A protein has these predicted regions:
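Catalytic-core signature of thiol
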Residues: 1-196
Length: 196
């Protein structure tokens, strides 16, 4: 900044452009902002789990809620069953229409039955869509809001699946191919110095 005494003017220059607003390492587990880890079983409900987990994370740590995956996957406006799979826009539509979320205790997962008489216990007012390769934007969203739902291509069908994309030494999965995403997960942190 500089001050011109002749014109009595203060000039300030913003030099912060390009400066990261997030740390090089961040983990929502260390801040009690990760919901219960659940198993989708053989159903194609990863998109529901990712959507509900991201919402639960956004409300933490102040509110420790568990939302129904069953309700989102069966009481939405998309005529699909739990084996058909889905995608993030289906979860967004369900939440934006205030069809849910509802509590998991009121509509538990895996019984193949849902209740249509349940009202949304939260009203989602705003959702953020981040460009797929905007890693800085993803980090900022995790840092500010909590878990971020994302889609990836996975070659892993079960814990017994062997794949060249999974590194057991670093517990990491990295697929850089061109196949379309087939699985949804929630990003809960990062480490810029993680061994690759």
């Amino acid at each position: 900044c500089s001050f011109d005494t002749a014109t009595n003017t203060l000039t300030m220059t913003d030099k912060s452009e390009g400066v990261s607003t997030v740390p090089t390492k961040y983990d929502l587990r260390e801040r009690q902002r990760v919901s219960l880890i659940r198993d989708q079983g053989s159903y194609g409900t990863c998109w529901d789990f990712a959507a509900t987990s991201a919402l639960e994370s956004a409300l933490m740590p102040e509110e420790q809620l568990l939302f129904s995956v069953d309700h989102m996957s069966m009481s939405n406006s998309f005529n699909v069953n739990q084996y058909d799979g889905g995608e993030y826009t289906m979860g967004m539509a369900y939440l934006a229409a205030w069809q849910g979320p509802v509590y998991d205790a009121d509509d538990p997962y895996g019984d193949g039955v849902t209740r249509d008489d349940l009202a949304a216990v939260k009203h989602v007012q705003q959702m953020l869509i981040i460009d797929g390769k905007d890693y800085q934007g993803i980090k900022e969203a995790v840092f500010k809001y909590g878990g971020v739902q994302t889609s990836l291509y996975s070659t892993i069908a079960s814990s017994k699946t062997k794949t060249p994309y999974y590194n057991k030494q670093t517990n990491s999965y990295c697929y850089m191919g061109q196949d379309k995403p087939n699985h949804d997960v929630v990003i809960i942190g990062w480490d810029d110095n993680y061994p690759k």
